[in-house]
Regions:
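Alpha-helical cap/lid subdomain in secreted, periplasmic
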Residues: 73-207
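Serine-esterase "nucleophile elbow" of acetyl-processing enzymes
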Residues: 1-58, 72-82, 86
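Structural motif
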Residues: 59-71
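Short, electropositive, low-hydrophobicity segments enriched in small/polar residues
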Residues: 18, 63, 95
Length: 207
């Protein structure tokens, strides 16, 4: 993109880190958040205002971002067509260790009756960190092959719809949490992210 072109909108596909401030969740317009910091820097460079279209949710993996891009009409019908650049900021949740398959964990809210759901949720919250400490995590939340596949689909879809607009990706972030007391999969996920980005000629920001 030449310096004479005006950058107006940046589409950010993210997870909870896109709206998580130092003390917790904040409004998506908070200037401390990385999508808004990036937009501010881009605005200075191009000399025109830049707005962020943030599509993110707590716990989102690359699969969820793909679903949002292809199933949410606001995203594929409004945000993507007007985007001058796309930031792919998912993949960090994919690498988190898990003690049960993700589809089972995500199915807990649908359990009925309510007492069964509440008991199952408490049991999971009590046992999962202990099992993770003991095992380092039996599996990832999403296999690396699936992460690469969904990220590739996102890039291909953006390029098919919006041509050669800039696409930037971010490496999986390190994490420190009592719920995920393991860095077991981080180094591999980070290395895989660089390999994936190189294969599709996508610039990667190392966080």
């Amino acid at each position: 993109m030449g310096s004479s072109e005006k950058l107006r909108h940046v589409l950010v596909l993210g997870d909870s880190l896109a709206f998580q401030g130092p003390q917790g969740i904040v409004a998506p317009t908070d200037p401390r958040l990385f999508p808004n910091l990036a937009a501010a820097q881009i605005a200075v460079h191009f000399g025109s205002p830049v707005e962020v279209d943030l599509v993110a949710r707590e716990g989102w993996a690359s699969r969820d971002a793909w679903w949002a891009l292809t199933k949410d009409p606001v995203v594929f019908g409004t945000y993507l067509p007007r985007a001058s650049a796309v930031i792919i900021a998912v993949g960090g949740m994919d690498q988190l260790p898990a003690v049960i398959p993700t589809y089972l964990r995500e199915g807990i809210p649908y359990l009925r009756p309510g007492r069964v759901r509440r008991r199952t949720r408490r049991l999971y919250r009590d046992l999962a960190p202990k099992i993770m400490r003991a095992t380092g995590g039996l599996m990832r939340q999403l296999p690396q092959s699936a992460t690469d596949r969904y990220l590739t689909r996102i890039v291909q879809a953006v390029r098919a719809i919006s041509g050669d607009i800039p696409i930037i990706a971010m490496t999986p972030s390190p994490y420190y949490s009592s719920y995920y007391p393991s860095q077991k999969y981080h180094d591999q996920a980070r290395a895989s992210a660089f390999s994936w980005a190189a294969s599709l000629d996508v610039p990667m920001v190392d966080i």
